[in-house]
Amino acid sequence: MAKSKFERNKPHVNIGTIGHVDHGKTSLTAAITKYFGEFKAYDQIDAAPEEKARGITISTAHVEYETPNRHYAHVDCPGHADYVKNMITGAAQMDGAILVVSAADGPMPQTREHILLARQVGVPAIVVFLNKVDQVDDAELLELVELEVRELLSSYEFPGDDIPIVKGSALAALEDSDKKIGEDAIRELMAAVDAYIPTPERPIDQPFLMPIEDVFSISGRGTVVTGRVERGIVKVGEEIEIVGIRPTTKTTCTGVEMFRKLLDQGQAGDNIGALLRGVDRNGVERGQILCKPGSVKPHRKFKAEAYILTKEEGGRHTPFFTNYRPQFYFRTTDVTGIVTLPEGTEMVMPGDNVTVDVELIVPIAMEEKLRFAIREGGRTVGAGIVASIVE
């Protein structure tokens, strides 16, 4: 029912609440839906359904709401581990985040951890909601907490001095007890989110990229590669590059077909077959990508932020050490890589999230924020994201 009433003529933005346990993320989510969406009570959001992303089970609650300017899809996770998994797997892509900090406690360990994760996985912007301000009588104390939050954000390379911080009480909003710190604060928060979190560039406006899933030879016509266009547009007659695994080559797309029909272009979201000029059936393979020339480079060495599954989640039963050699599943293929642990880290236990250095045995078309699964013999044992490219 709720699906029908959202008009799609507004820009769509994906956001989520992050922050320390019990600082009020779920209450705030409920309060936002009260004024901007179809009201969802705290316990409706807290009973988050489980879903699978890259072979990992995550509990996530999804709500949607809209301001006069935008339509929002909002994710809230019940447990800390769910946040870690969610942000690393990209199960719920975030264009921005609302960091919830209790004014009574100030920044806590998970506050720091979520900011670090947001930095590592490339969340573009953060807005802060200083919650539970009714529990703090001293204005100076409130100012101190705000300063602390700004310094913490700056220490992780977010613009701490410029980030909007809105003070209020999610509970007051839910209980209609104090309009100023309740409803008014929630409306002020959403105005800040509207203004400060940038509208994401639509996939269709980005440079063309398509992971190759399959390769066919069609007699008399040449080689066709199939896959789902990840972003951008490819037009018949355009020059494109084949990147990854082998040296980069240029070719021309001489045909695009979808559902057995010939088209003059393929665009983000389309499952297409692309006919490639002068490419031998053996000259291209699954795991490579087609892309706009010069837009993506192949790389072997990168720093990754990774989450390692627990035994209960179907992961490893034992820790791993430096020189661990699993497969890294990028887009459509597995590539073996050698893992180097950070200095001072002797081993990584199942359930840890960790920053590691990886060197692949062959180069893969790679950009920062590219996500991957870590596998051993086809079984997923972890998930990760490229935090930065080394070479």
Curated annotation (Swiss-Prot):
Spans annotated as G1:
19-26
- Write one Gene Ontology MF term: GTP binding
Q: Which GO terms describe its cellular component?
A: cytosol
Where is this gene product found?
Answer: Cytoplasm
Top-rank taxon of the source lineage equals Bacteria
Q: Which reaction does it catalyse?
A: GTP + H2O = GDP + phosphate + H(+)
Recorded hits in CDD domains, A to Z, give: EF_Tu, EFTU_II, EFTU_III
Where the record annotates domain tr-type G, the positions are 10-201
InterPro entries membership: EF-Tu_GTP-bd, EF-Tu_GTPase, EFTu-like_2, EFTU_2, G_TR_CS, P-loop_NTPase, Small_GTP-bd, T_Tr_GTP-bd_dom
The UniProt annotation puts the region (G3) at 76-79
Chain positions covered by the region annotation G2: 55-59
Q: Which residues lie within the region annotated G5? A: 169-171
Q: Which UniProt keywords apply?
A: Cytoplasm, Elongation factor, GTP-binding, Hydrolase, Magnesium, Metal-binding, Nucleotide-binding, Protein biosynthesis
Signal sequence coordinates: none
At which positions is Mg(2+) bound?
A: T26
Enzyme Commission (EC) number: 3.6.5.3
Residues given in the record as GTP binding sites = 19-26, 76-80, 131-134
Summarizing the function annotation, the protein's role is:
GTP hydrolase that promotes the GTP-dependent binding of aminoacyl-tRNA to the A-site of ribosomes during protein biosynthesis.
Q: How does it assemble?
A: Monomer.
User: Hey, which family's this protein in?
Assistant: Belongs to the TRAFAC class translation factor GTPase superfamily. Classic translation factor GTPase family. EF-Tu/EF-1A subfamily.
What is the designated name of this protein? Elongation factor Tu
Name the species this protein comes from: Rhizobium meliloti (strain 1021)
